[in-house]
Every structure is written in C-alpha cells, then in structure tokens.
Amino acid sequence: MKFHLPLPGRRLRRILTLLGQAALCCVLTAARLGGLYAPFSLAAAAAAGPGLPGLLSLLGVTGGALLFLDFQPGLRHAAAAVLLFAAQTAFCDTKLYRRPAFRPLTAALSQLLIQSVYLLYRPLSQWVLCLTASALLAAATALLTAHGTSPRQKGLLYAAALSLALVPVTVEGLFSVGKALLMAELLLLSRRLPPLTAGLAGACAGLAADLVPETPALLLTVAYGC
C-alpha cells in the first residue's frame, strides 16, 4: 500500500529543508581560518544557488558572521555572500551558470574582490591566507555542486567542515577533538571516493585544519593528504 504525503506535509518538509540550509550556513561560519575567513559557509551558500534557498542561505551566512566573526571580518564575509548571491541570481538562466566551474569560481572571486580592498596595504602573509582560503572555498564549492557527489558524501563534507570549529577544543591538552573527528570523517569519505580525489580532499582538510589557529602552521596538510 502506498501512502502519499499530503500537500501541507510537503510544504512543511520544504520549509524545514530551507531553514536547515540557512542554519547550516550560519553554523559553518564557526569554522574560521585564521580568525578572518569562513569559506565553508560561503561554499554552502554557493551550493544553495539562487532563489529562495540562496536568499535564506545568505541570511544564514550573515547571522553566522554576526555570531562567530569580529565586526570587520564579519562585515566583509557578509558582503562577499551578498555579491555571490547577486552573481548567481544574475546568471542563473544562462548557459554559463550550468558550467561546472561557474559556481566555484564565482564564490572564490566574490570573496577575493571584497577582501582585496582590505588587503591593499597588508603584508604578504595576509594575502597568502586570503588566497588559500579562496582556493579552499572554490574546492569545497566544486565538490558540493558536482553531479557525481552523493547526498551522503555531501553530509560527510559538511561534517568535516563543522569539525574544524572544534579544532581548538582539546581534551586535557592531549589531543584536539576537531582533528580526531576530521580524521574519522576523512576515513569514511575516502572509502567512497577515487584515490586521487580522496587524497586531494584530505590535503584540503589538513590545510584547513592548519589554518584554523590565528598563527597558522602547515603540519597536517601532508599527513591528511597521504
């Protein structure tokens, strides 16, 4: 016997899905790199696309910027999200939007355009951090918007990004909770990805974990990529 979900139930599920996407974008802002960038919340907003899902994701990113970032970095982060949403809305009906590289490049360029004004008279290390965060943003967006990425894989990617927020949390100063979770999630993800893709995902995760502290040190990039 088949049961059909009534229309109010479908609407409720749709509303909950949209609110969940907005909440995810908000919480992902806690995964900060260098205390200045939150590329994975922008990647989730880029994956949401234009229209109502994109608008609610924009609100989620803005809320996360207020909660988890200082005022100036949060303002730039929210501005990048606005620019990203505007670009996706402007091109959503074109052939260009359907190209696999469009959303990853648009997300990275939105962040770079906003941040570059602030970085004009900053040291080279700040530029390197911004470029690295933008590269991670493009990579995460590409994985989330790829046609071959299953919902389970996307869930593991989101879980790995959320684990970055727990990297500073340690148990009796012995090990990082976020790093332990990140390694476990990468092991699960590597079983469902080709070896090269799994290695790249591990390297990106290690690089992101290295950049979480305000004084980054590249220690885990190679380890997680192996």
Protein language model annotation of sequence segments:
Residues 2-226:
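Membrane-embedded alpha-helical hairpins and interfacial helices in multi-pass inner-membrane proteins
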